Structure formats: structure tokens, C-alpha cells
């Protein structure tokens, strides 16, 4: 699938701006004279949490094009045989998957590819020049099948919903902890003091890191599905296995983190817990064990 710094940065930026805006407008009235209004806080957290993730989803295509410098191929006037082949291959895969034909783009970079877009029938599949130059056609077709499977499986929307849920918990818990720290440690009796805001910021960072582990785990499960989807679309497991094996011997290109989850290669995460992609040997083993329908 591809899905976690551009998506997360955009998501976090929207959350922060929205939080500040709601406070300026006086719409964050979950702290009252009687204490913390948990129902009001939950509603506030839902608005902030889901708005950030959905705005990130809606602008994912233009942000992907901008951040990678991807050039969309004109379907009516491909400039080379390679571009014509890419269009034809992606369109065939999309037709088999039962989705609208996505935009197809090429960007300069080391081996990688990604898919993004808010809707199945209005998506983008992009592949790097490094991948095109280092893989055989059947392997490139498998990678394209993997990306089309991400779109068909609705992985960007799934990631957005998961991100919205974890955002909500991060916003909610950070403010609950901030309130109690401000009351019990800093002894604030009326309203909230500096301790509340400092605690909220620290908790949002800490809880955000923990939440990213959950998002990464879901992303890894969707990667297995996309690998299997590529095999189903191609009618054989071998092209996807060969593509992964070749990718394992290459230095995959970094993507903006927001698109790593929908890329073919991992994002080079420090720990497996934070990786959006399973290890390549595990992905190959899963493909070898699957049954084609």
C-alpha cells in the first residue's frame, strides 16, 4: 500500500492549526469550572483527529507529485515506448482489478514506486526511473500490480481511518494527562496554567510515537495483501517474488514518509516496529505459501 513523514507532517500540521483555531474561536470548552468535561473533550478530539487525516488524504495526489517531482504521462501522447508500455500495463491491471484507470507517473530516483489518492477511481501510480532501469518488464509489471492492488484494496482510505482513530486517542489522552498534571503537580485551581500546555505538547509527542507503531503494524498487514493482490492480477506468484528478490539486492529509494506505506520498498525505518513494510524474506515466504484462486 503506500502509507508515514509527509502524510504525518501534513496530518500533524492540520491538527495543530485546527487545535489553535478552535481554541481562538472558543470552541475547546472542555475544561469547565466543575472540571474536565470528557464528552466535550471527546468531540473536540474526534474533530481534530479525523480532520487532519482526511485533509492529508484529500491532498495526497498533488502533494505526491510535488514532493517527488513525478511527471504524469499523457495517456493521449506518451513520449516513448517505455511510457506507452507503462500506461498499457497499468490500465490492464486496473481493468482486471475493477477500478478506474489511475494516472501514471515517472519520477527520478532510486528503485521504488508508490500509489496514492483519495478515491479508487481517481488515483495515481508512480514509478521511479531507478526501478524501471534495474528490473525486467515482468518484475516491473509485478510492482505495478502491487500498487494497483493497494488502490483496489482501499489502503489509503484504510490508513486514513486508522490514523484518524489514533489521532483522536492522542489528542484525548494528552489533554486528560495535561489536566491532571496541571491540577495535582502544578496546583492550578482555576482554568489551566503553563503546566497544562507543556504536558499536552510532551504527551502528544510521546503518544504520537506510540501511535505510529500501531499505524505501521496495520501498514505491514496491507503490504502482504498487496503482494498477494499483485500475484492474483498477474495470475502467477513468480513475477512478484522475483521483483521482491531483486529489490532486496538493491538500495531502495526513500519516499516522503507519507507515501512509504503505499510504496513497494520499505522506508528504512530504525526499528521493525516503526517500519511500514515487512522484511522482504517474510513477504517472499508469504507469497510462496499462498494459493492462487
Curated annotation (Swiss-Prot):
Domain of life of the organism encoding this protein: Bacteria
Membrane topology of the entry: Multi-pass membrane protein
GO BP terms, alphabetized: proteolysis
Keywords (A to Z) from UniProt: Cell inner membrane, Cell membrane, Hydrolase, Membrane, Metal-binding, Metalloprotease, Protease, Transmembrane, Transmembrane helix, Zinc
Cofactor binding notes: Binds 1 zinc ion per subunit.
Subcellular location: Cell inner membrane
Keyword Endoplasmic reticulum: no
Cofactor dependency: Zn(2+)
Active site: 147
InterPro entries according to UniProt: HtpX_protease, Pept_M48_protease_HtpX, Peptidase_M48
GO cellular component: plasma membrane
EC number(s) per entry: 3.4.24.-
Positions that bind Zn(2+): 146, 150, 223
Transmembrane segments: 4-24, 40-60, 161-181, 198-218
GO molecular function, one term: zinc ion binding
Family, per entry: Belongs to the peptidase M48B family.
NCBIfam families recorded: PRK05457.1
Protein name: Protease HtpX homolog
Gene name, Swiss-Prot/TrEMBL: htpX
Amino acid at each position: 500500500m503506500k502509507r508515514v513523514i509527509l502524510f504525518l507532517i501534513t496530518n500533524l500540521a492540520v491538527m495543530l492549526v485546527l487545535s489553535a483555531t478552535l481554541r481562538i474561536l472558543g470552541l475547546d470548552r472542555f475544561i469547565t469550572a466543575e472540571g474536565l468535561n470528557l464528552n466535550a473533550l471527546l468531540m473536540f478530539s474526534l474533530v481534530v483527529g479525523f480532520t487532519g487525516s482526511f485533509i492529508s488524504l484529500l491532498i495526497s495526489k498533488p502533494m505526491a507529485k510535488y514532493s517527488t517531482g513525478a511527471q504524469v504521462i499523457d495517456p493521449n501522447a506518451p513520449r516513448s515506448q517505455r511510457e506507452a508500455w507503462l500506461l498499457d500495463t497499468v490500465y490492464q491491471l486496473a481493468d482486471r482489478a475493477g477500478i478506474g484507470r489511475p494516472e501514471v507517473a515517472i519520477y527520478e530516483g532510486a528503485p521504488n514506486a508508490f500509489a496514492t489518492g483519495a478515491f479508487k477511481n481517481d488515483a495515481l501510480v508512480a514509478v521511479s526511473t531507478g526501478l524501471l532501469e534495474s528490473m525486467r518488464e515482468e518484475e516491473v509489471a509485478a510492482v505495478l500490480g502491487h500498487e494497483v492492488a493497494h488502490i483496489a484494496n482501499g489502503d489509503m482510505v484504510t490508513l486514513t481511518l486508522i490514523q484518524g482513530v489514533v489521532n483522536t486517542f492522542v489528542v484525548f489522552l494528552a489533554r486528560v494527562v495535561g489536566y491532571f498534571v496541571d491540577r495535582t503537580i502544578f496546583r492550578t485551581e482555576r482554568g489551566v496554567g503553563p503546566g497544562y500546555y507543556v504536558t499536552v505538547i510532551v504527551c502528544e509527542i510521546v503518544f504520537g510515537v506510540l501511535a505510529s507503531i500501531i499505524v505501521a503494524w496495520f501498514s505491514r498487514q496491507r503490504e502482504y495483501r498487496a503482494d498477494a493482490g499483485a500475484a492474483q492480477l498477474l495470475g502467477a506468484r513468480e513475477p512478484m517474488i522475483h521483483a521482491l528478490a531483486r529489490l532486496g539486492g538493491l538500495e531502495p529509494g526513500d519516499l516522503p514518509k507519507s507515501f512509504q506505506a503505499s510504496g513497494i520498498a520499505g522506508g528504512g525505518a530504525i526499528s521493525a516496529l516503526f517500519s511500514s513494510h515487512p522484511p522482504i524474506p517474510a513477504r517472499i515466504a508469504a507469497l510462496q505459501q499462498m494459493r492462487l484462486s
